[in-house]
Curated annotation (Swiss-Prot):
Family that this chain belongs to: Belongs to the CDI family. ICK/KRP subfamily.
Keywords: Protein kinase inhibitor
Protein name per the record: Cyclin-dependent kinase inhibitor 6
Signal peptide: none
Compositional bias ranges of the Low complexity kind: 1-15
GO molecular function, one term: cyclin-dependent protein serine/threonine kinase inhibitor activity
Gene Ontology CC: one annotated term: nucleus
GO BP, one annotated term: regulation of cell cycle
Region (Disordered): 1-23
Gene: KRP6
Tree of life domain: Eukaryota
Length: 86
C-alpha cells in the first residue's frame, strides 16, 4: 500500500497555496506579470463603441418594456404605463 500511495503522490501536482476559496490576491505571487503592450484605442473609437453599446441597450429595453429611456416616455405596446406619485 505504501508503494501505491507513493505513486499517487508523484502523479499529483505540487500543492498550491491558492485554492478556489482563497482571494485572487493569493495567486498573484505565482503568476508572471505581463507587460502592457500597445496603447489605448483612440478616444473617437472608444466613444463610437460606447455609443453603439448604449443604443443597443436602449433598443432592447424599448422592445421588452415598450418604454423609450432616451425620451423618458412610454410607448404603445403590451404594457400600460401609469404615473405614480409618492
Amino acid at each position: 500500500m505504501a508503494a501505491a500511495a507513493a505513486t499517487v503522490t508523484a502523479v499529483q501536482p505540487a500543492a498550491s497555496s491558492c485554492g478556489k476559496r482563497d482571494g485572487d490576491n493569493a495567486c498573484v505571487v505565482d503568476m508572471p506579470r505581463k507587460a502592457k503592450k500597445g496603447r489605448s484605442p483612440p478616444e473617437e473609437e472608444v466613444e463610437a463603441f460606447l455609443a453603439a453599446a448604449e443604443s443597443s441597450v436602449a433598443r432592447r429595453f424599448a422592445a421588452k418594456y415598450n418604454y423609450d429611456i432616451v425620451k423618458d416616455a412610454p410607448m404603445d405596446g403590451r404594457y400600460e404605463w401609469v404615473r405614480v406619485r409618492p
